[in-house]
């Protein structure tokens, strides 16, 4: 299977890598790898849209250069193993790969082999959700994990006592990867993974909705989340940069959601909403 690698380069003293990643994630790439002053984005050759990239207005307005490479037979395991260290979410929780050895015993030991999917806990967006999940009682809850990626949020929800979780992603790689991680964490039968978008939740209701996606999807889907949230339910929204906070707050108010709290980490924000 052939892939197109687009290498974005920039001066890290001029451009924040987190902002670059947030903006280019709006384009149809499957995965990203980061280095100082450089982000590599990957898409299958048949899915790569060169015209969309060249027409992307944000790139025209900012000092970011890019070039294309055609590659095949990527060893994804080798790629993510280079940069994936265990991450401690709290004194009680660690996210690690199967090859990591840890000395300390954690109450919540989450095994995640990310492959190409987003969501290991290293990025501020995922870390914020993992951290705040410990603020709530998931016992017996019905949970929705939108944009599941590796499935790590759904897995933690089950470990925290949720009765079941629906994990949704529009990326086939995420579907496969989340399924593998569900097995690794002995959560089979409790987490259902589906490929698609918010139309899959029509007619369903949840006690907790975990939405760690991007600005455009969040703004478009907030009305569906409000409908799907039980009366005393909680919606955790992540993946929003500071300059987009007001847009999300305005949309949430418009659909009848009430802001309970807001936390920022590395220019990324997590919202806790209730009805």
Where are these regions (language model features)?
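S-adenosylmethionine
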Residues: 170-275
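N-terminal auxiliary segments of SAM/dcSAM-dependent transferases
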Residues: 2-104
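Conserved beta-strand segments of alpha/beta enzyme cores
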Residues: 31, 65-67, 94, 164, ...
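Conserved SAM/SAH cofactor-binding pocket of Class I
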Residues: 116, 120-202
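SAM-dependent Rossmann-like transferase core, predominantly class I methyltransferases
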Residues: 75-139
């Amino acid at each position: 299977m052939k892939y197109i690698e687009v290498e974005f380069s920039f001066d890290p003293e001029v451009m924040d890598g987190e902002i670059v990643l947030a903006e280019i994630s709006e384009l149809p790439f499957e995965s990203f790898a980061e280095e100082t002053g450089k982000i590599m984005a990957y898409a299958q050759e048949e899915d790569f849209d060169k015209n969309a990239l060249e027409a992307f207005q944000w790139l025209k307005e900012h000092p970011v250069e890019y070039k294309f490479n055609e590659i095949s037979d990527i060893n994804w395991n080798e790629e993510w193993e280079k940069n994936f260290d265990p991450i401690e979410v709290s004194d009680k929780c660690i996210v690690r790969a199967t090859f990591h050895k840890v000395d300390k015993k954690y109450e919540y030991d989450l095994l995640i082999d990310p492959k190409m999917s987003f969501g290991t806990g290293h990025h501020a967006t995922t870390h914020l959700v993992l951290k705040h999940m410990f603020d709530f009682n998931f016992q017996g809850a019905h949970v929705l994990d939108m944009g599941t990626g590796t499935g790590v949020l759904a897995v933690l929800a089950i470990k925290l006592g949720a009765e079941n979780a629906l994990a949704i992603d529009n990326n086939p790689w995420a579907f496969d990867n989340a399924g593998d991680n569900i097995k690794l964490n002995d959560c089979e039968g409790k987490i259902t993974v589906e490929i698609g978008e918010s139309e899959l939740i029509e007619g369903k209701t949840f006690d907790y909705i975990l939405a760690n996606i991007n600005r455009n999807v969040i703004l478009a889907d907030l009305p569906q989340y409000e409908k799907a949230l039980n009366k005393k339910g909680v919606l955790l929204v992540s993946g929003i940069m500071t300059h987009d906070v007001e847009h999300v707050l305005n949309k949430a108010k418009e659909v009848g959601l009430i802001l309970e709290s807001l936390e920022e980490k590395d220019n990324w924000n997590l919202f806790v909403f209730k009805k």
